[in-house]
Structures are given as C-alpha cells and as structure tokens.
Curated annotation (Swiss-Prot):
HAMAP family: GlmM_B. Keywords: Isomerase, Magnesium, Metal-binding, Phosphoprotein. It comes from the Bacteria. Activated by phosphorylation. This is Phosphoglucosamine mutase. InterPro entries: A-D-PHexomutase_a/b/a-I (IPR005844), A-D-PHexomutase_a/b/a-I/II/III (IPR016055), A-D-PHexomutase_a/b/a-II (IPR005845), A-D-PHexomutase_a/b/a-III (IPR005846), A-D-PHexomutase_C (IPR005843), A-D-PHexomutase_C_sf (IPR036900), A-D-PHexomutase_CS (IPR016066), Alpha-D-phosphohexomutase_SF (IPR005841). It holds the Pfam family PGM_PMM_IV. PANTHER family: PHOSPHOGLUCOMUTASE (ALPHA-D-GLUCOSE-1,6-BISPHOSPHATE-DEPENDENT) (PTHR42946:SF1), PHOSPHOHEXOSE MUTASE (PTHR42946). Belongs to the phosphohexose mutase family. It comes from Mycolicibacterium smegmatis (strain ATCC 700084 / mc(2)155). GO terms for biological process: carbohydrate metabolic process; peptidoglycan biosynthetic process; UDP-N-acetylglucosamine biosynthetic process. The modification Phosphoserine is found at S110. The keyword Phosphoprotein applies.
Amino acid sequence: MARLFGTDGVRGVANRDLTAELALALGSAAARRLSTITTATATDSAERARRVAVVGRDPRASGEMLEAAVIAGLTSEGVDALRVGVLPTPAVAYLTSAYDADFGVMISASHNPMPDNGIKIFGPGGHKLDDATEDRIEELVHAGAVARPTGTGIGRVLDAEDALDRYLRHAGKAVTTRLDGLTVVVDCAHGAAWAAAPRAYRAAGANVIAINAEPTGLNINDNCGSTHMDVVRAAVVEHGADLGLAHDGDADRCLAVDATGHVVDGDAIMVILALAMQEAGELAANTLVATVMSNLGLHLAMRAAGIDVRTTSVGDRYVLEELRSGEFSLGGEQSGHIVMPSFGTTGDGIVTGLRLMSRMAQTGSSLAELADAMHSLPQVLINVAVADKTTVAQAPSVRSAVAAAEAELGDTGRILLRPSGTEQVVRVMVEAADEDTARQVAARVAESVSLQG
C-alpha cells in the first residue's frame, strides 16, 4: 500500500482520491495522535481541559466539504475545532502556536490546480510533523473506529474572528524599513493571499495593485500566481510598478519580478536576503540552507560573500529540518518557499515579500540591482508524466541516460533527476553554460524517462 502522506501532507483529486471519508478519518486520527489528554479523561466533565485544533483552508470549492469532514473527525474525538477560515498556510502554522493549540490543520493543495486538494497537519508550535508521527497517524486512519466521547465530551466548533488581524500583526514585524513610495503589483492567484497580502503590503506603506484577488472557489491558480509569472510580469510593465510579487494558492511561496519584467526567483531572493541578514549580523552561523534544485549561481554568489550553503533534498520540510537542527536563520527553495525561523515555522510568502521590499527601501536600490548579486546558469526543467514515478526514475535506461548527460556536462553544469513528492511526474533539471546545451541534454534525458513511463 502506498504511503498516504507525501512530502507536503496528503494530496489528491478532491472527492476521488481525497474524499470526505478520508478527511474525517484523518481528523480523527490526528486528534488521537496529537492531543495531549486521552479520550478516557474527556468523556463527561464539563470542567475538563479542552483540546484545540486550528483549522484553515484555501478558497477552492472542495475546501468547504473537506473542512466540514476534518472538523467532524476532530470533534468526534473530543477536540474543539478553532475555525480560522480562508488564510495562508503560514498563518495557520503561526496561529497554531499563537492560540496555544494542540495542533493545526490546513486544507489546501498549494499551487496545484483547482480539482486537487490536500490536508497538511502541524504539530504543537506550528511545526510540520516528522515521518514517524505521520506514519502513526496513517496507522490510525487504517485502524478503524474506536470508542468515542459522548455528551459534553464531544468537541465544539469555534470561529476565530481575529485570526487574520492577528496574523497580519505578526507578519508586519518583518518590516525593517517602511515601504512608502514603492509601488508593487501582487498576484494573489485567486487563493488564500487574496485578502492578507494586499493588506499586509499596504499596512507597510506600499502602493499596492492587487490582481487575481477575486476567488470564486473555481479559479484558484488558473493561469495566475507564482506558476504563471507572465501575468504579473505584464502587469508590472503596464503599471510602471517598482516590482511585482506572485503567490501560490496557499501563499507559502513568493516569487518576484523587477521593474523591467525580469523574474527574480527563490534563489535570487535568498541571495538578497542572505546578504542583508549577513550585513545586519542576523545570518546565524553565516549559513544559508538551500535544496539540490538551487542554481549553481546561488552557490557561487554565496561563496563570494563568504557565506556557507547547506544543501538538502527538495521540499521545504527538509529545509526546515536542517534549519532546526543547525539553528540556522534562513533557508528556502528556488520555487519561492523562503523560511526565516524567527518569523515562522514554514515558508511564508507574505513575510518574504515584506522582507524583500524592506531591503529595497533600506538600500534605495531597485530589485534588478539587488538581484544582480547572483548570476544564474541557464536551467531547464522538464516534468515528465509517468505511471510509476519511483520505478521509472530508477530504471536502468534512465540511469544510463543520466550518466551520459553527466559525462557530457562535466564541470560546466549539472543534472538532477527525481520523482516529484506531490505529483505523478519525474522532474528532469539540467544546468549548463548555455541554454541550448541545457535544453538538448534535458530533452534527451526526458525522452528516456518518457519511454519508460
């Protein structure tokens, strides 16, 4: 049986893979595993210490169904559900800590298309769960029904009316220099950032032009947001803005565009923030944490600045693990997941946007000038849809194609092939001295993957 949890929670097509029944079972299992008191002590006493779980979601249509199912699972185990509504994933993580909840649940499929949805669980303090805890929850999902509380022991559903304001006050602490005079276009992806991001940036003083900020439940990530940067690029040029920011469906990512429409990806953002934090004496151990997907240009820029780079597997959970184990202060991914542990336990697109604009305001430099600290090697990424991503990635013919590509590139580039943690695809990434070489090498390797798929 395939593992229920992927690299970022449980995901699938809503009502087919991720059903209401599964959502209820996950809510129930999480309550049993993560609550701090047992069901046996929580059956009849109205004076008992209530266990609490924060529950949030993005605006996709299936979120309402899955939210109701998760809450049913929680309350059936005697856990109160503190419903915070449509909020970014990092807000739910923060509020899990701020409300001193036992755990938190975010219902979102992030950058995935509208038919998909997902369930992500945060432990105490808003931290992502480790593999062992996820495995135990999965065991409980498959274990079936158990004796449950009755009467006053059943959990209640509460609404946190101050949730958004509380998160915005927290995010605002990331502002080191007021943003007065800066004009920013923000693409909210018709997602969880639709209200939070424009408010956060305006509160910091920026002139904000919000686009794709009218969620219907059906239009999340639909040709917009951080996976469709051409939209914000065009808007920045049209409005003559200083920069553009693009979030994904749950706003844990942030990518940027300079005034000319040039994309500033997560690698470049990390370089900008690392240099700023080094200057301020805030870069712990003079170290940045990045993943194997980060461009070689990031490593060269950090080496020139005397900053060490710790490299992890792909996925912000692995970045988080390295940040926590090494007590580092900055890490992230090329995709725009940027983590600053002093501000949160997970990637926060809005905090990233505020920090990036603060650096612009502090230095008086344009985003293009700041991004010039890093020069990326041409990078080509091809996603190949396959039936069994793990088997295909390990096929002898595919490994042979990768070895041949590595021999061809030598010291002038690199290749990375890996199964996606969230989609049924194998990702082929190639960096080379010139784009033509990168494309040709990537195409050959992708063809070998496709033939196996």
